[in-house]
Structures are given as structure tokens and as C-alpha cells.
């Protein structure tokens, strides 16, 4: 079952206390989004990093409490966000499991790491939500998919939606096995989009356009096309047909794409990436 949520769905997190373990790229993006959208008071926000210098930098930049000790940081917090790499997850969970409680919500961004794995590592009935954002979150245009663990209640999901709604759109799924497909499609998807942008740009350059102009035309065209799909709700095939006139320029270009096997290549990319995600998942 899919619960469709958008970033305009919001409840107040003002009185909640939030700790972000790992203020790296995505962790800092979340922190920035939370602050800009006034979701949580600054005095109720905290972040941790492995290096003292980086902790001081974050403190100075955002005016929040920063730590290098995760155990100290999570005390009294309502929401704990694990914005760390999967190879670090076991060590971090082992460090905090003795002091974490079932009243705290854990949100994990660690790729290929199931809610069950986190629950087992913590050795308690802890509410855990798995989140898969993507890199456009860095400019608040992300796509995040959430999947709740077995101890999650509706209010936990609503809080997670608010947090990730600060950096883009949010969807919720309840079948965790689909997170491997999510990883392959929206998690890895920006890389596929970039190679398409790069290739179309090269095509424009080959035919005489200045490189920067070709890149801008390509990026804006794909951005606009994506927004049309989202805003109109129309099937991409219908939108494609609206651009394709009989005996026109577009149909010849489409024929070359079909001849090159673009559909099959993209479908196979998702299939292979999904299998890879399954291979490394735990």
C-alpha cells in the first residue's frame, strides 16, 4: 500500500528535540532544511561528527549544539536521524543501544540497511523508519521514500514526512522489499539522468551549439518535462505524442533512440541495480 504525501503536509515539530548522527552532505542538508522551514527550534537541534573541527564548523554555521560523542547527544532527544554510511551503522548502534529508549524515533538513511537489522542491533522494541533520499535533496528538490519498521505508529510517520518534506517530495511504502527498487530508481536515478543530459548536450555540441548553451537547453528541457509529468499526471507516452507531429523532426529523433535500444537499456539498468541492492542489503 502506498500513502502519497507531499511537502505541503505539515505538522509542528517545534517542541520535538532532534539529533542528527553524521552531519555530512545529506545530514547537513536535512539540518539546513529543518532550520529554514522552522520545523524545530535551534535549541532543540543537535548534530554529531567524527571530527572536532567539523563539529565546531557546524556549530558556528548553524548555531546548534554539536558533539563528537553520540551517546551524550541523543539523551533526551525525540528523533534520532542516522545520516551515516552503512559500514558505520553497526558500530554506531552498538555505541548507543544501552541508552536509547522505545520513546525515541530512529530514522535511518543508511543505504541497504533494513529496519529489522537496526531493530536487532538495538536489541529493543525501538520505532525505526528507513529513508532513501537522493542527491537533488542538496538543492531541496529531493525524492525521499520512507518505509516504517514494525514498531512504528502513525505519528512517527507524520514526523518523518515533515523532516524530509523540508528537502523535497516524500512517499511512504509499507513493503520493505521494494526499497531495493527504490534505491535503484530514485536513489541511483540522478546518475542515469546526468548521463542522458551529458549525451544530449554532446549531441547539441556536435551539431554546432556552444557547450554551455547546449547544457542549459538540455537541463531545462528535462526539468520542464519532468514537472509536466508531475503536475499534469498524464502518462509520459501521451506527453511524448503531443510533441511528435507527423513527418516532423521529433519522430526521426525518436526513431534513432528506439534503434539504439534506449528503452531496454534503461529498464535493464533498473533491474541490474535492483539486484545489486539486494546483494548488498542486510
Regions found by a protein language model. Give the residues of each.
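Internal alpha-helical scaffold of NAD(P)-dependent oxidoreductase catalytic cores
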Residues: 117-127, 143-181, 194-231
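Small-residue helix-packing motif on alpha-helices
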Residues: 45, 55, 73, 210-217, ...
Amino acid at each position: 500500500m502506498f500513502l502519497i504525501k507531499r511537502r505541503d503536509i505539515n505538522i509542528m515539530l517545534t517542541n520535538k528535540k532532534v539529533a542528527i548522527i553524521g552531519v555530512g552532505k545529506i545530514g547537513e542538508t536535512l539540518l539546513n532544511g529543518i532550520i529554514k522551514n522552522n520545523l524545530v527550534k535551534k535549541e532543540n537541534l543537535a548534530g554529531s561528527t567524527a571530527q572536532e573541527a567539523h563539529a565546531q564548523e557546524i556549530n558556528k554555521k548553524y548555531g546548534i549544539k554539536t558533539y563528537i560523542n553520540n551517546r551524550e547527544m541523543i539523551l533526551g532527544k525525540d528523533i534520532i536521524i542516522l545520516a551515516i554510511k552503512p559500514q558505520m551503522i553497526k558500530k554506531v548502534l552498538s555505541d548507543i543501544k544501552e541508552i536509547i529508549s522505545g520513546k525515541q524515533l530512529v530514522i535511518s538513511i543508511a543505504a541497504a540497511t533494513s529496519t529489522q537489522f537496526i531493530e536487532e542491533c538495538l536489541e529493543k522494541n525501538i520505532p525505526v523508519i528507513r529513508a532513501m533520499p537522493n542527491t537533488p535533496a542538496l538543492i531541496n528538490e529531493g525524492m525521499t521514500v520512507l518505509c516504517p519498521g514494525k514498531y512504528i505508529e502513525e505519528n512517527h510517520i507524520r514526523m518523518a514526512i515533515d523532516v524530509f518534506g523540508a528537502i523535497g517530495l516524500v512517499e511512504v511504502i509499507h513493503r520493505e522489499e521494494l526499497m531495493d527498487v527504490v534505491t535503484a530508481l530514485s536513489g541511483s536515478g540522478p546518475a542515469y539522468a546526468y548521463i542522458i543530459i551529458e549525451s544530449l548536450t554532446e549531441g547539441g555540441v556536435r551539431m554546432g551549439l556552444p557547450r554551455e548553451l547546449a547544457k542549459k537547453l538540455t537541463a531545462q528541457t528535462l526539468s520542464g518535462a519532468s514537472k509536466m509529468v508531475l503536475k499534469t499526471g498524464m502518462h509520459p507516452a501521451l506527453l511524448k505524442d503531443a510533441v511528435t507531429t507527423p513527418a516532423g523532426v521529433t519522430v526521426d529523433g525518436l526513431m534513432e533512440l528506439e534503434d539504439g535500444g534506449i528503452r531496454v537499456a534503461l529498464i535493464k539498468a533498473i533491474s541490474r541495480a535492483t539486484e545489486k541492492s539486494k546483494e548488498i542489503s542486510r
